[in-house]
A protein has these predicted regions:
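Short, Lys/Arg-rich, polar N-terminal cytosolic tail immediately upstream
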Residues: 1-6
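Membrane-interface helix-boundary motifs at transmembrane edges
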Residues: 77-84, 144-153
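Membrane-embedded alpha-helical segments of integral membrane proteins
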Residues: 93-146
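Internal/C-terminal transmembrane anchor helices
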Residues: 149-177
Length: 242
């Protein structure tokens, strides 16, 4: 019986450590570039037809990074164990099916969960969230087995400090260049070198098509089978990816 209890505590602590580290990292890299996070949130809103919320993207970006950072700190330190594990489970219960939808239908190129610091595919994001959801379920069920780093009387200070710190850090990076710039064209980068195409890399190919009309009949032509002058141009040429 004592052995089983020890195993449960160890598993709970491992899950707590995993969730805490991931949430702190995710919140930090979002706060590093809150404007980039706002742009990504705007992509989400456009994909789901919620353009009316576009004016609030920066506000959402600030608070999302602060919430993730606060939950990560509280998870690691055992602060408000019941509420922290519940909010973490609630967030993962929302994010996991959302990332499954992204993986299947691909409305945005990447989820942006780790900003520009670590770009992963939508399927990789979904698999990551499945693991985090399982860990969140376990720590929520066994939250009383988690060790506490502080007494109950200072819980509010730890939670408030972590949230305010993340907001202040994001605000600083919003008004100045990021302290840690993960973007490809950051200050000091060689832009011509970054824009060059590596040797042997596949290049884009384009095909031009023209729609001409003769005797009321419209036909599409390419540059290879261009018609004679008796046809009238119906639409101007437009390139398309091959």
């Amino acid at each position: 019986m004592e052995y089983k209890e020890t195993v449960k505590k160890v598993i709970a602590e491992v899950c707590r450590l995993l969730l805490g580290v991931v949430f702190i990292f995710s919140g930090t890299v979002k706060a590093v570039d809150p404007m980039g996070g706002a742009i990504k949130i705007g992509d989400y809103l456009t994909s789901f037809g919620l353009d009316k919320l576009q004016p609030f993207t920066v506000l959402i970006s600030f608070n999302l990074s602060a919430l993730e950072f606060m939950l990560g700190v509280c998870m690691l330190l055992g602060v408000y164990r019941r509420y922290t594990t519940f909010l973490t489970l609630l967030m993962m219960s929302f994010m996991t099916p959302l990332t499954l939808y992204l993986a299947i239908f691909n409305p945005v190129s990447d989820c942006g969960c780790f900003g520009d610091a670590l770009v992963i595919s939508n399927w990789q994001t979904f698999y990551k969230n499945v693991v985090l959801l399982a860990a969140a379920i376990y720590v929520f069920i066994h939250n009383q087995r988690l060790l506490q780093g502080y007494t109950y009387h200072v819980y509010w200070f730890v939670a408030l400090w972590s949230y305010v710190f993340a907001i202040g850090f994001a605000y600083r990076n919003y008004n100045h260049l990021p302290i840690l710039d993960f973007r490809p064209y950051k200050l000091g980068a060689n832009i011509p070198a970054l824009m060059s195409i590596p040797e042997g890399a596949p290049e884009d190919e384009y095909a031009y098509s023209f729609i001409y009309e003769r005797d009321g009949v419209q036909k599409e032509f390419s540059l290879e089978n261009y018609p004679d002058s008796t046809c009238l141009l119906y639409t101007s040429p437009s390139p398309r990816d091959m």
